Every structure is written in structure tokens, then in C-alpha cells.
Design a protein with these regions (language model features):
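Bacterial N-terminal signal peptides
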Residues: 7-18
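Short S/T/G/P-rich N-terminal loop/turn motif that feeds into the first structured element of a domain
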Residues: 19-226, 230-259
Length: 259
């Protein structure tokens, strides 16, 4: 009778899924995330940041919102503040926002901080779920300042699953190999926000220059060129520029949990 190989040896031999892959799939983050982009009125970005620093984050926490990260673009002509929240569910998010908006403490803060005019001219909100290949999404920090990168990919019709497969099977590991820190991978929940064709993710770098060096090495890696060619034998997985891939480099605010 043949002896059975231990599961760990079978995994190493590629005969069964690896234990880490199985664990990551089993531990997929079930929370709902919200990516919000605020456009500050001219001359009001500092005031908006002060309101978040001194009041809003605490009120968000009071009403069950998890603050993950707050950033401003390195190049910020539109005076954007970008942040990421987490909730137990979409219903929980609705209730949290309802309770926050009705809180007398928030109403008082809003009135005082907008005595000389509104701080925000436009708000964009996208609800997200984590992909099954996303790392654990948490508000990590580092001893040295870091630069974040928000990347948005849009696919041709019917190609999102193939793009996910390429990230799951190849890109995530190659990013790690080339020193690209990975904060989280997401897909929008709503059709009008790109549920069928959009992948959104956040990377973490030592600097914008370090990001450029890492991506140069990544793109030159034979493992990447082979994976890209194989995955695109039936056509590209992202739309042509400038719509297919968008990148925004971000600096954490001084009050951001993730830095």
C-alpha cells in the first residue's frame, strides 16, 4: 500500500492548493468599505483637515465607523481629501451615516466651521468590498514617512474576472517580490460605480521615486511578461489609456490612522 504524503508536501509539490492560499480565501474580509473624495472650496482645505482632525474622526468612531486612512494627493490642484472607512455591512453604513448626520455635536461643529462659508464643494462616495486576494486591510503605520498610491483599473466588458485571476495568481506575488507594499484590493459594490469592470487598490511605497524603480523592475520581470502575455491572448484586460489605468500618489494626513 502506498504511503500518503503529508498535506504540506503535496502543497509544495503543487498537487493541492497551498495552505496560505486556502487560509487567505477563508479569511476574506467581509466588511463593507467606503472610499470618499472631498473637494475643498478654494482656500478651505486646511480648515477641512482641521475639522477632521479635531472633530470628525472622533464622531465617526462614536457612530461605529472605522477610520482606516486619510490622504491628500501629492499633486492636488483640485484640493482633494481622500479617505477610507470600514463598516460591518452596507446597512450598518447607512445607519452610521444617519446617526452621525443627526448628532447635535456634529451639527454644532458644522455650523461653527462653516461660519465663513462651506468647506466642501463636492463629495464622491464609492462603496467597496475586498477581493479574495487582498491582504488584511488595517491601518498600518511605519517609522519612516510613506507614500501611498491609489490605482484604479477598468476592464473591457467581461474581463474583470480575468484581471482578478491575474492579480490573484501572479501580480500580487510579483509586487511583493519587487518591494511594492499592498494595502488592499477592492471592487465597487454598485453598477454605476463600476461593479462589473473596476478594480481599485492601494499600494504603499517609501517614496514616489521608489515606486517608479519598483514598477520598472516589475515590468521587466520575465515572470510578469509571461503572465501578461498568457492572460491577454484573447485581448487586453484593461481599457486603452487614459481610461484603463489611473494612478494618484497620496500623502497621509497628520491625523490619518494609516501612515
Amino acid at each position: 500500500m502506498k504511503k500518503l504524503l503529508p498535506l504540506s508536501l503535496l502543497a509544495l509539490a503543487g498537487l493541492v492548493p497551498s495552505l496560505t492560499t486556502a487560509a487567505s480565501a477563508a479569511e476574506k474580509d467581509s466588511r463593507v468599505f467606503e472610499l470618499r473624495v472631498y473637494y475643498a472650496a478654494p482656500g478651505k482645505l486646511d480648515d477641512l483637515n482641521a475639522r477632521f482632525r479635531n472633530h470628525t474622526l472622533k464622531l465617526f468612531e462614536k457612530h461605529g465607523m472605522t477610520n482606516l486612512g486619510y490622504w491628500v494627493p501629492l499633486d492636488n490642484p483640485d484640493r482633494q481629501l481622500i479617505y477610507l472607512l470600514a463598516f460591518p455591512s452596507r446597512d450598518a453604513a447607512r445607519q452610521s451615516w444617519k446617526d452621525f448626520s443627526a448628532d447635535p455635536a456634529w451639527k454644532e461643529v458644522a455650523t461653527k466651521t462653516e461660519a465663513n462659508g462651506r468647506l466642501v464643494t463636492k463629495v464622491e462616495s464609492t462603496y467597496l468590498t475586498a477581493t479574495d486576494f487582498s491582504p488584511a486591510i488595517r491601518a498600518s503605520t511605519a517609522d519612516e514617512p510613506r507614500t501611498f498610491e491609489l490605482r484604479t483599473y477598468r476592464t473591457p466588458p467581461g474581463k474583470l474576472a480575468a484581471l482578478h485571476a491575474r492579480f490573484r495568481d501572479h501580480t500580487v506575488g510579483l509586487f511583493r517580490k519587487h518591494g511594492l507594499g499592498q494595502f488592499g484590493y477592492f471592487t465597487p459594490m454598485d453598477k454605476d460605480k463600476g461593479a462589473a469592470d473596476t478594480l481599485i487598490y492601494l499600494l504603499v511605497h517609501k517614496s514616489k521615486e521608489a515606486a517608479a524603480e519598483a514598477f520598472t523592475a516589475f515590468r521587466a520581470d520575465p515572470a510578469w511578461t509571461a503572465a501578461k502575455a498568457a492572460s491577454e491572448k484573447d485581448g487586453p484586460l484593461t481599457l486603452p489609456a487614459p481610461d484603463g489605468v489611473k494612478s494618484v500618489f497620496l500623502k497621509p494626513t497628520d491625523y490619518s490612522p494609516a501612515k
